Amino acid sequence: WNFQMMAANDYIVVAPNRRGLPGFGQEWNEAISGDYGGQCMKDYLSAIDALAKEPFIDENRLGAVGASFGGFSVFWLAGHHEGRFKALIAHDGMFNFESQYLETEEMWFVNWDLGGPFWDKENPVVQWSYANSPHKFVDKWTAPIMVIHGAKDYRICFTQGMQAYNAAVLRGIPAEFLYFPDENHWVLQAQNGILWQRRFYNWLDKYLK
């Protein structure tokens, strides 16, 4: 994610240091675990709302983009942004927590971040986590969304992206699925990186410029 390139393409970049990111200590860094869809989402929205008041910001042409946890964030925000965003891009993000729990290759992360399996009805952290799975808010989606995923991503399988794309299409929302059969959680091959950048900016330019 090249913020300088985004700025060079005439975009103002807002990158909130929300909960879960380094810089404010371990407690801040771990604050997202067990609270997906909670305070960290308020961090995003409070940041964009504050910046939207500035005279150099066009609040009618805002977009949200993210990868990994940021991809999940975009899927979640898609159902909660209340008209703030006019275009979305989600790269390798979790969309359906229940299927994610059973298809990831690394169980430690889903147990730590989501609290455990979705069938544990006695665990309040589990119940909160799965209640905030982005797929449960598709009925509130309105903004055009581009979904990007690599077939060799075993941490967050490409089926998460496919589900999100299909959901958008079935809702009648403009959507695009950029699928890399030879990439994992990252886009590492030069030719794929060029394609990624090209489609990324084409999508944003189409809806925000």
Located regions from the model:
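Active-site-proximal cap/loop segments of hydrolase catalytic domains
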Residues: 1-9, 13-209
